[in-house]
Amino acid sequence: LDGDSTLVQMGANANEIVIPKISMDGLADYSRNSGYVDGDVTLTNETVSFNYDRGRAFSVDAMDNEETAGVAFGKLASEFIRTKVVPEMDAFRFATYAGTSGISKVTAGATLSTGADVITALRAATTEMDEDEVPLEERYLFITPTLYGTVQDLDTTKSREVMNRFASITLVPQTRFYTAIDLYDGVTDNSDSSGANEKPGGFVKAATGKDINFMVVHKPAVLQYTKHTVNKVITPQENQSADAYKFPYRVYGLADVYENKVAGIYLHHK
């Protein structure tokens, strides 16, 4: 869902981008005497601040790496991105979109127990987006593997036609599919005061968060950009503080929804 970076420009501050928005008048009566009625076209710019800035640095002793034939460090980098970075970025984006005021969503949370229930809920989602005149093109469905499986297991006489109304279908594990999350700062330990130990970092489902069943996203409705990524290797020869490989990773970006395109998000949660 990453957006087209050519449509944005940097703001006055380094942590901002400027997004163009356009509005225009509708049709008017045509006169055979005076011709066309003039209309107004307004182009405005919205300034949006980046809202995601996360990072970690790891060290692997040179001897540990040598004694494992390089597996120690090589495994660290790939596993960190696969098991920590990608799930958190997904969770942050989904929670941000789900928490946006004005999006379309199910009236009350519901558990979808059967494939027929899922089909009915998806049909309601597409119908609402159709009625809101959200373009059919570039509608993406994000759904849990469990619910997708119930649809695939339906009797072949049951209609799955609604599944063809999406540009693509992406399976999202429930463990990163919530309406709200808490990002741990990696420093604080409040476990002694009945709080959370945030030192391990990462994210958890927020107390107010609900499990998402599925989300339909019209790509032009979201602002999703990664401005800066640091993914580098510092060798023991370059490391001034220890005889160790160092792996610093940082990602800085934005996930938001255009305020005039909130109908392009449909949320169904438990």
Predicted segments, located by residue:
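Short, glycine/acidic-enriched capping/hinge loops at junctions between secondary-structure elements
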Residues: 29-34, 260
